Amino acid sequence: MFYMIGCASSAANATCAISIRRRFATTAESASAAIKLIDEFKKNHGLSDFVYASDEMYLAAGQELPTFEECGDFEQIENGVGLFRRFEHDFMNALEDLPTAPRMREFDSVSGVSIAPHMSRLFKKLLPYNIKINVHPVVNDFFGNTVTVTGLVTAGDIIKQCKDCLNGEALLIPHTMLRENDVVFLDGMRTDELAAALQKLIWRVSADDGYDFIDDIINLIERNA
């Protein structure tokens, strides 16, 4: 597996970002060693906002994700650096405009194994608004169980692992799982085929923007009142 290390620098009012990829074994020990290397580089060179470890590196190491403030300007967000913290920050702000549903609405959601506990804790913030989202971590049998990111989860694995444990009225699918106009998974299965196999409404939701995610939930509730 590749872990992402994002590097960014600014000069003459222009900001550029480069990405450095290095192969690390998918163990907590190697991920921890990589994070330590990055921290030492920052300390030794006085470059606190120059190099960052991706969220996946911290998750693999079993370490707490950096805070929102520690993620800098999120210049490497496309490489997974600070992705969850920005989503969380925007999600919490968006809650201020979320109307309380007139009755309890329950949905299911799927994710990669590594981020599932964080998403589950975050979604509990929706309970006062009469919205319950059950998070189902999906082990990646298609690419190998050392692959734990959400964007590489396939429909076949969702069917095998979740078919008998979905209690909500719809299944939320993070948009990063989908390709080809947001309807095809990496294993070639379409969202309508997944819906037929699970006998569930499939609803695409944003996986990287907390504001958009809340809007997606509002639209789901309004269209299925």
Give names to the regions the model predicted.
Residues M4-A225:
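Auxiliary Fe-S-binding modules of radical SAM enzymes
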Residues M1:
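Active-site-proximal cofactor/substrate-binding loop regions of enzyme domains
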